[in-house]
Amino acid sequence: MAVIGLFLGGTAAWADEAPLRYVNLGDSYSSGAGIQPAVATAPPQCSQSQLNWAHDIARVKRYQLVDVSCSGADTSDFRASQSPGVAPQLNALTADTKLVTLTIGGNDNSVFTSSIQKCATAAATTAGQGNPCQRAYGDSFVDTINSSNYPNIVKALKDVRAKAPNARVAISGYLTILPATQGCYPIMPIAAGDVPYLNGIQAALNNAVKRAAQQTGATYLDVTAISQGHDACQSPFKRWVEPIVPINAAPVHPNFVGEGVMAKNALDVLGLGIGIGL
């Protein structure tokens, strides 16, 4: 839990002296959906938290943060308004932007929400036994990720580079949601045999993000290994992702510890540990 102290201790004397323009883009994993306190100046529909990974990074490094991440965003929302009062996310990027972080891709084609909802619905028909979701949907989710989500992420990253040519761009994968094999029905209402199936879908999504980063010169922030054992089936003091039961503000999303882990991982991978400049 040392990561909590790292990001809740306020700004530090060792942080960078000159403010550096830092822009955070993306979806609900990036915005810290459901984590209080919310950012009062952000559009309420974006569910942006003061404890999301970008705010953690900015606090430690004393960067000048422009956070336009928004819950529900997909790659099309980089170029068009997501909803009234929410500008295209690419509008936040400028030539003097030095760092860009983001999570994106999971909401394209509703892959993230749809796979979980459909598998939960299927599990209810078998009381959590067997693999009804896999039998019903087979390779359809992974095929969609590879044929549509992946090129969408590539285009989004290319657009980011075009708008912020002088920035380091880092895109994170999604934290592990389920254990490797054994689930926790009905806390996470996924049938026992569909746990590996959903893990395969998440692995395909993270791999699409990784490949897109490699193709566009962005840095991929891998969180799969470090989040093993901290999935939504773990105890409240161990999990980094919240379960569906009991009801909470943002199920199947990172809690504030998970966001802190994402922040620390970004700093480590980018070589921006405490006191190290960009």
Each model region followed by its residue ranges:
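Secretory targeting and sorting signals
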Residues: M1-D16
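Serine-esterase "nucleophile elbow" of acetyl-processing enzymes
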Residues: D16-S71, C119-A124
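Structural recognition of the beta-strand scaffold that forms the well-ordered cores
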Residues: R21-G26, S30-G32, Q64-S69, K98-T103, ...
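Oxyanion-hole/transition-state-stabilizing segment in secreted/luminal serine hydrolases
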Residues: A33, S83-I145, T176
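A structural motif corresponding to the C-terminal end of an alpha-helix
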Residues: D56-Q64, P151-V169, A204-D222
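Charged, often glycine-rich, active-site loop that binds/positions anionic groups
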Residues: A73-L90, Q234-P246
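A taxonomically broad motif for mature regions of secreted/extracellular
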Residues: N109, A124, Y150, L198, ...
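Catalytic His-Asp segment of secreted/periplasmic serine-dependent ester chemistry enzymes
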Residues: Y174-G277
